[in-house]
């Protein structure tokens, strides 16, 4: 039934990174099956609490003791509606403290903002790199500092020198988000 609907066809610009580092842009036609919209609240504290319970219980299983630690990806507009900043920082710290013998849980935040005028950021290295927007900076503070063994991969993705990075992006491109998720979820 959905396929038979008369849906609009959109011209979408795609960005793809080639193995040699060049970026290829192309335009493809895509049907818009469902029109995205935002409505309602963002119960981020409740989502983080559920994530905490899941990683805590998973890490408590003896067979998982030496496994690669869990990775939590939070995709959000950044505006938690069910707690204040201190409450979000507290539950995020609890998530980041749970782990295995291979390391602690990585909490990675993907902040999608309606303000497209700001420069996109992937694996932020400081709060100052982000727009002067409290939700972006809060998500930076609650994101995990990435383990040093990822620094070279992150620096290659960002096109910069290795430094300290956080698992946080702000309005990043689809290509960069996929790169972020690949880096954050691959055991090294």
Feature names for model-found ranges:
Residues 1-188:
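Acidic, low-complexity intrinsically disordered regions
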């Amino acid at each position: 039934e959905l396929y038979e609907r008369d849906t609009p066809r959109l011209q979408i610009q795609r960005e793809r990174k080639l193995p040699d580092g060049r970026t290829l842009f192309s335009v493809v036609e895509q049907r818009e099956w469902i029109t995205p919209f935002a409505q309602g609240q963002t119960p981020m504290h409740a989502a983080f609490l559920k994530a905490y319970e899941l990683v805590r219980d998973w890490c408590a299983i003896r067979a998982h003791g030496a496994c690669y630690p869990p990775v939590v990806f939070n995709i959000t507009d950044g505006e938690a509606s069910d707690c204040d900043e201190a409450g979000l920082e507290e539950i995020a710290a609890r998530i980041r403290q749970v782990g295995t013998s291979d390391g602690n849980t990585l909490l990675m935040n993907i902040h999608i903002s309606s303000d497209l005028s700001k420069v996109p950021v992937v694996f932020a290295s400081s709060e100052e790199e982000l727009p002067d927007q409290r939700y972006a900076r809060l998500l930076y503070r609650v994101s995990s500092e990435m383990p040093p063994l990822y620094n070279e991969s992150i620096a290659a993705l960002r096109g910069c020198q290795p430094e300290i990075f956080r698992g946080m992006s702000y309005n990043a491109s689809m290509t960069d988000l996929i790169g972020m998720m690949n880096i954050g979820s691959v055991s090294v």
